[in-house]
Amino acid sequence: MTRIRRGYIARRRRTKIRLFTSSFRGAHSRLTRTIIQQRIKALFSAYRDRDRHKRNFRCLWVTRINAAIRENAVSYSYSTLINNLYKRQLLLNRKILAQLAILNRNCLYLISNDMIK
C-alpha cells in the first residue's frame, strides 16, 4: 500500500493554538499537548479574573473612601456615609467617591458634612 499524506486541517488548528501561546515560556509554547493545556488554563484564568478585577477595585474604592471619611470626623464611617447617601437619594457611586477622596478631598468633606447635618 502506498502512503497517504495527511490533510492540512489538524496542522492549521495546531498552528492557530501555537500562535495564541507563542509568548509563553519554555515547553508551554513548543509542545502541542502542553500548549493545549496552557491555552485552556489561560482562558479560564482570564474569565475568572475579570470578575476578580471588579471585586478588587470595589474593595479598593471602599477602603479609600473609609480612610478619607474617618480622617474628617471621628465617629463617622463609610457605612454611615453610604447609608446617608441612599437616604438623600444622591447618585454618587463608589468609584466617584474614591476619586474625590484622592483628588479633591475638600469636596468629599463638604458632602460628608452635609450628610451629618
UniProtKB/Swiss-Prot annotation:
InterPro entries for the chain: Ribosomal_bL20, RIBOSOMAL_L20_CS, Ribosomal_protein_bL20_C
SUPFAM superfamilies: Ribosomal protein L20 (SSF74731)
One Gene Ontology molecular-function label: structural constituent of ribosome
Pfam families in alphabetical order: Ribosomal_L20
Gene Ontology CC: one annotated term: chloroplast
Main localization (coarse): plastid
Family of the protein in this entry: Belongs to the bacterial ribosomal protein bL20 family.
Protein name from the UniProt record: Large ribosomal subunit protein bL20c
The organism of origin for this protein: Populus alba
Native organism taxonomy: Eukaryota, Viridiplantae, Streptophyta, Embryophyta, Tracheophyta
The gene coding this protein: rpl20
